[in-house]
Amino acid sequence: MLKETYYNQFKGWGTEIPEEAHKVFVMRSHGSFLAPSWELLRDWQAERINWEEYKERFRNEILSSVEARTIMKDIKKRSKDGDVYLICSCHNKENHCHRFILINMISQL
């Protein structure tokens, strides 16, 4: 099953992730192909764009990346046999984090 968690919860302050679960860090600081570009992240954090524009730009970034599409297919496959956690450092404020967009995109594959 595809799941998500906030990085600080994963590090021992909340969500208990089973040892056997597959963990996918989707943070730019971890070099993830599933993270937003620095430009998109800066635009969002500086409030130069709204959530709808962020989602559209993020989807376009991901869909234009062969690496990201390949990783998403692998996540979808793994999630059929066990838990897969997408982990990011964004706070859960109103689900405004790209990991929720990714869950939706992967579910639609």
State where each predicted segment sits.
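Residues lining hydrophobic/aromatic ligand-binding pockets adjacent to catalytic sites
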Residues: M1-L109
